[in-house]
Amino acid sequence: GFEGPLRPRAFDARKAAGVSSSPFEAATLLKNASVDFGIWTTDKAMPALARDSDGDLLLFIHDGEGDLFCDFGHFAYREGDYILLPRGTMWRIEPKARTVSLLIEAINGSYKLPERGVLGPHAVFDPAALDTPKLDAAFKAQRDGEWKVQVKRRGALSTITYPFNPLDAVGW
């Protein structure tokens, strides 16, 4: 038993998340000066690109699958994937199924690979398992025309409108 004000807590974060096409409308779960944890549910393609200038963004795909398009190319995501979006990266997703993501923003910071340690099946992390976006047919077939980019800087949102799709990389 417990005596005093300390009590175990458990909550279903998915119940906190309303459905939105913008990751900047994610429900905040925990936040301090270094990190912002939120939960985001979306079931349709993002109508605008997103760019976070405050820090690196890590998405953990709790449920769902779809396609992610960013400055570096395209790749398909699915349940259980971690997606790292470095600060300043423009990106959007097109879910094929309702997608629930945990968003972890490293405010004024960045994510780094862990120190090398144990190798093999007992390793905490295997860099060989990393995947990167590709400049494939899906990336090249994106809709052209006017695109909006929602930019988060110092916690505030601004919108930039381009007369073309700014996700137009030809190599990296």
Give the residues covered by each predicted segment.
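Jelly-roll (double-stranded beta-helix
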Residues: 1-172
